[in-house]
């Protein structure tokens, strides 16, 4: 196993995750099997209970792990599936070590950061890397490890010490360190290297040396700037990689390839360069022949909360040669005029009461005005509530989560008595059986599918017959549980309890999103 560790300096938010995912993609394009690990130095066990407005999207993995959004980038760029083992947090590491100490596993030793915490980190990285198998049964040859945060952060210190030990243990040929740093421009447009020099100095103080430096900038990095960084930071000039901001993140692997990243990295890892597979580049470089505008009705004002939805729309749009322009509409602030200008409406997932009535009003507008609609998770539940109120006749229909009224949406039976909120929802992959005559079955090309879930509530079985008698059909089920719905007399009114966006890939767009984008495009053509 060979390891590529990606660290960051100067400031957070530079795009380490996209850089790590892009490195994985160019290595796959050279014929290698690659997996990824993300280290998040926070004390939370996982991302499940973190405020999405602060942390961004909670990405759900196939085994039910609730992870950082970078795991979603890895899955999309590398076209792989990961598990909760591939997301390490300080909370997981310390919890495991303390549990082992209580169990007596350390045989009376004084438990310390070094060696016990660092050994736990290394063991978990190694386990995640070596246990991963792709859909064809291939084991990974290279593991990309992204260390969250910035070099110098106190939270990252045990992880960086573990990385230092890994470098010593594996040595050149099996280990490479890629450091992502900021190259800010002054008022004259010249890129400044001093922050990078200080960042490399901080890295050295921890016993680490960068093998490759990736300079993030809105401008191209000149050869003279690369030479300056090379001279001050002791890396080969060819190992100073320009990472100029790209108009589309899926173009980043192409830009890194042009900069020679793959050749430098493979040389460091003592691997053959191999022939580049250009399939990825043809996949992401398609031309658009049409354009649609989709409104996403949001509870949270941060686009990163909905990154998988945004990417799934992009995947479907590319597949259909249709550019998807997204209008982000606050559920509490939008107007009917905002909805009238859209080609389609998407209601995403979320929790809590805020913005719910605005989402329900948008669903009613889409139903009555025959505007394509896709509802996801909470969006699915709100479609049921809107229909119960305005068609079935229960004016006080609501969710048990929201308060008093007719509970069209009820708590899952297995959630009764659950006290801990973390990791206790219905999470991860579950099978869904589709009605063979449904639109979704046609889109999936199958009646038995698997999708990812994240919810505590479901359609109340008491009202299913009444709802279906009025024309809303539940076309996807898991046993007695309702998983998907459609309206027959509508161009595209589809909602799912599951999250199809989490399994969407550039090469394999999500079926509900394909249907949604296609319906939006047809609606626009008719206008």
Curated annotation (Swiss-Prot):
CTP binds at residues 12, 153-155, 192-197, 228. Pathway: Pyrimidine metabolism; CTP biosynthesis via de novo pathway; CTP from UDP: step 2/2. InterPro entries: Class_I_gatase-like, CTP_synthase, CTP_synthase_N, GATASE, GATase1_CTP_Synthase, P-loop_NTPase. It is an enzyme of class 6 (ligase). GO terms for biological process: 'de novo' CTP biosynthetic process; pyrimidine nucleobase biosynthetic process. CTPSs have evolved a hybrid strategy for distinguishing between UTP and CTP. The overlapping regions of the product feedback inhibitory and substrate sites recognize a common feature in both compounds, the triphosphate moiety. To differentiate isosteric substrate and product pyrimidine rings, an additional pocket far from the expected kinase/ligase catalytic site, specifically recognizes the cytosine and ribose portions of the product inhibitor. It catalyses: UTP + L-glutamine + ATP + H2O = CTP + L-glutamate + ADP + phosphate + 2 H(+); L-glutamine + H2O = L-glutamate + NH4(+); UTP + NH4(+) + ATP = CTP + ADP + phosphate + 2 H(+). GO terms for molecular function: ATP binding; CTP synthase activity; glutaminase activity; identical protein binding; metal ion binding. Residues 1-271 are annotated as: Amidoligase domain. Mg(2+) binds at residues 70, 146. The active site is at residues 377, 499, 501. Residues 294-526 form the Glutamine amidotransferase type-1 domain. Its EC number is 6.3.4.2. Homotetramer. It comes from the Archaea. UTP binds at residues 12, 192-197, 228. ATP binds at residues 13-18, 70. L-glutamine binds at residues 350, 378-381, 401, 456. Belongs to the CTP synthase family. It holds the Pfam family CTP_synth_N. Gene3D superfamilies: 3.40.50.880, P-loop containing nucleotide triphosphate hydrolases. Keywords: ATP-binding, Glutamine amidotransferase, Ligase, Magnesium, Metal-binding, Nucleotide-binding, Pyrimidine biosynthesis. This is CTP synthase.
């Amino acid at each position: 196993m060979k390891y590529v560790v990606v660290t960051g300096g100067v400031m957070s938010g530079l795009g380490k995750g996209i850089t790590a995912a892009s490195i994985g993609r160019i290595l796959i394009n050279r014929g290698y099997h690659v997996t990824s690990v993300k280290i998040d130095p926070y004390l939370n066990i996982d991302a499940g209970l973190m405020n999405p407005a602060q942390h961004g999207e909670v990405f759900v993995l196939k085994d039910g792990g609730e992870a950082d959004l970078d795991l979603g980038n890895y899955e999309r760029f590398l076209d792989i599936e990961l598990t909760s083992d591939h997301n390490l947090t300080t909370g997981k590491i310390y919890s495991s070590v303390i549990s082992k100490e209580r169990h007596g596993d350390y045989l009376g030793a004084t438990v310390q950061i070094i060696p016990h915490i660092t050994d736990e980190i290394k063991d978990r990285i190694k386990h995640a890397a070596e246990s991963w198998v792709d859909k064809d049964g291939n084991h990974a040859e290279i593991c990309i490890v992204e260390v969250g945060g910035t070099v110098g952060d106190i939270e990252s210190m045990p992880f960086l010490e573990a990385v230092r030990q890994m470098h010593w243990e594996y040595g050149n040929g099996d280990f490479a360190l890629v450091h992502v740093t900021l190259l800010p421009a002054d008022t004259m447009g010249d890129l400044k290297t001093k922050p990078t020099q200080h960042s490399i100095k901080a890295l050295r103080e921890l016993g680490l040396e960068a093998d490759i430096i990736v300079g993030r900038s809105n401008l191209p990095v000149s050869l003279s700037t690369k030479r300056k960084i090379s001279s001050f930071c002791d890396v080969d000039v060819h190992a100073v990689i320009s990472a100029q901001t790209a108009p589309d993140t899926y173009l980043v692997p192409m830009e890194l390839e042009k900069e020679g990243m793959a050749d430098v990295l493979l040389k460091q890892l003592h691997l053959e360069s191999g022939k580049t597979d250009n399939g990825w580049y043809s996949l992401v470089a398609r031309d658009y022949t049409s354009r649609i505008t989709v409104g996403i009705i949001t509870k949270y004002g941060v686009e990163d909360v909905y990154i998988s939805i945004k990417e799934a729309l992009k995947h479907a749009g590319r597949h259909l040669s249709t550019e998807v322009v997204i209008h982000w509409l606050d559920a509490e602030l939008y107007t009917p005029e905002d909805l009238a200008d859209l080609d389609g409406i998407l209601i995403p997932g979320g929790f809590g009461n805020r913005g719910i009535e605005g989402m329900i009003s948008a669903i009613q507008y889409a139903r009555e005005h025959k505007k394509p609609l896709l509802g996801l998770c909470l969006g699915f539940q709100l479609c049921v509530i809107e229909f119960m109120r305005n068609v079935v006749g229960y004016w006080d229909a609501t969710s048990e989560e929201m308060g008093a009224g007719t509970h069209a949406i009820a708590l899952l039976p297995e959630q009764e008595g659950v006290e801990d909120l973390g990791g206790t929802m219905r999470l991860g992959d579950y099978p869904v059986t589709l009605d063979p005559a449904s639109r979704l079955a046609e889109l999936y090309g199958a009646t038995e599918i698997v999708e990812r879930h994240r919810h505590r509530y479901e359609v109340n079985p008491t009202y299913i017959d009444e709802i279906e008698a009025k024309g809303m059909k539940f076309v996807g089920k898991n046993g007695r549980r309702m998983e998907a719905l459609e309206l027959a007399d509508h161009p595209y009114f589809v909602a799912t309890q599951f999250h199809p966006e989490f399994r969407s890939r550039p090469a394999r767009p999500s079926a509900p999103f394909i249907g949604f984008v296609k319906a939006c495009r047809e609606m626009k053509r008719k206008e």
